[in-house]
Amino acid sequence: MTRYIFITGGVVSSLGKGLASAALGALLQARGYSVRLRKLDPYLNVDPGTMSPIQHGEVYVTDDGAETDLDLGHYERFTGVPASRADNITTGRIYQEIIQRERRGDYLGGTVQVIPHVTDAIKEFVLSGNLDVDFVLCEIGGTVGDIEGLPFFEAIRQLGNELDRGQTCYIHLTLLPFIPSAGEMKTKPTQHSVKELRSIGIQPDILMCRCDRPIPKDERRKIALFCNVRETAVIQAMDVDTIYDVPNAYHLEGLDDEVLSVFGIKGSKEPNLAKWQTIAHNIREPEGDVTIAIVGKYTGLKDAYKSLSEALVHGGIANKVRVNVKWVESEVFDTEDTAFYLEDVDGILVPGGFGERGSEGKIRAAQFARTRNVPYFGICFGMQMAVIEALRNVGGLEGASSTEFGPTNEPVVGLMTEWMRENELVKRAAHGDLGGTMRLGAYDAMLAEGSRVAQIYGSTVISERHRHRYEVNMTYREQIEAAGLLMSGVSPDGLLPEIIEIPDHPWYIGVQYHPELKSKPFEPHPLFRSFVEAAVEQSRLV
């Protein structure tokens, strides 16, 4: 029997529901159970693909090409279970599907309403494809009381009645603020949040209380009394040094035991958390430090590069060093010297992005890394800027540019209008919609024998996740390689460049895909492991 755990939030957003869900999934896995994690987002966008990274954070891409919420990245990193298109849904997508059904006449002339049509669609999403899974964890985005979230709360309330007794568990994440002037922790926001949840028919089984200090016994007892839960169900969710210590911390608080108790499961084996303890130890007690500059255009919100930041942490774990990230807004190089920002770093990473703003700064960062022999990692847009830089400054092609920035006589980077996916030709109109029209998901690449990337991967055939609509123009291949960049990875049909590298540089690699999306703390991505290793070597030269 599949059991369902619904994770909701109250008081304020950004309390860490995604991390709590991922950590609980990891704890249940460590006890021998199979898990599946899903995210229900109440916003009206069909997916986050066209949303600003500064508003929404990163867009996490799955193997099957879905553009999803960044929380799915936490789910994958903590559990190792690959997410898919079926693990994230939005109000926009539900409404889109319902309206399409209505236009087809599927409702036979009936009035289409939020209840039952929208709530039924949400329930159908939650219950689908779970036959072989012990636990399904569903996180509801936003906070209780948000008007756009009401259909989701109503749907999970109905599921509590429709599923068998003991088949559902409701976990509510709240904030326990400490008021310095009063010298005490306040429980009233939590009480009101639970009151709001109960007013729509949901009684939480477990409360996870986010706090920055231990919860006094009296406050814990008070929360249990006024929120109608057992004292043992008031879980202290304190801040920790690293997110990879969260599974250990929640286990010590008894979260997994309490969840199993809600389901009436007895005699479950103790979780094996050895790998999490090792990871947390390596992060807390590194053998050294390196500094990596991330030269990006969305540095105002670090969540825009969430998977990237975590992949660097994973590379640090593999090399037993702490990776200190120096965030550099690429536009500063339009007016300031790159050396002022980059001369003290051990590696430079230029991540993906869209649009002309900040592009010249990224080109200058690539030039600095190439000429100063500093390890350079260009991802997606970062690879494209590295190619443009080399052709301008080494290849003598001063007009080298991208058609993304406007008309150019030297379209070194251009819009893709067709590509192959699973032996089928995919076409995109040059002036079509932006949403869902990129080259998305996992694609194979063939690596050159003897190349650095082939040595790093230990293979000449790889599969990586993509998210881009512009690509380095293959007609410039001879000029690119004459400028010193080896095209060491291409698509299986040989038509799309995937990887460039400089063979005689300490470490200079650009990739068209997003390797950060497949990195995990217990399985660091080979490129990030190698890049941080190169940064360690660079730090020893200073």
From Swiss-Prot:
The Swiss-Prot or TrEMBL record annotates one GO molecular function as: glutaminase activity
Q: Which UniProt keywords apply?
A: ATP-binding, Glutamine amidotransferase, Ligase, Magnesium, Metal-binding, Nucleotide-binding, Pyrimidine biosynthesis
Annotated Gene Ontology cellular component terms: cytosol
List, in alphabetical order, the GO biological process terms annotated in this UniProt record. 'de novo' CTP biosynthetic process; pyrimidine nucleobase biosynthetic process
Could you say which residues bind CTP here? 13, 146-148, 186-191, 222
Q: Cite the binding residues for Mg(2+).
A: 71, 139
Tell me if Metal-binding is a UniProt keyword of this record.
Answer: yes
Region annotated Amidoligase domain, chain positions: 1-265
Q: Which InterPro entries match?
A: Class_I_gatase-like (IPR029062), CTP_synthase (IPR004468), CTP_synthase_N (IPR017456), GATASE (IPR017926), GATase1_CTP_Synthase (IPR033828), P-loop_NTPase (IPR027417)
Annotated active site residues, numbered on this chain, are 380 (nucleophile), 514, 516
Q: In which pathway does it act?
A: Pyrimidine metabolism; CTP biosynthesis via de novo pathway; CTP from UDP: step 2/2
Instruction: Please report the stretch or stretches of sequence annotated as the Glutamine amidotransferase type-1 domain.
Output: 291-541
A Pfam family of the record is CTP_synth_N
Under NCBIfam families, the record lists:
PRK05380.1 (NF003792), PyrG (TIGR00337)
HAMAP family documented for this protein? PyrG
The UniProt similarity line reads: Belongs to the CTP synthase family.
Cite any additional comment in the entry. CTPSs have evolved a hybrid strategy for distinguishing between UTP and CTP. The overlapping regions of the product feedback inhibitory and substrate sites recognize a common feature in both compounds, the triphosphate moiety. To differentiate isosteric substrate and product pyrimidine rings, an additional pocket far from the expected kinase/ligase catalytic site, specifically recognizes the cytosine and ribose portions of the product inhibitor.
Name of this protein: CTP synthase
Q: Which organism is it from?
A: Parvibaculum lavamentivorans (strain DS-1 / DSM 13023 / NCIMB 13966)
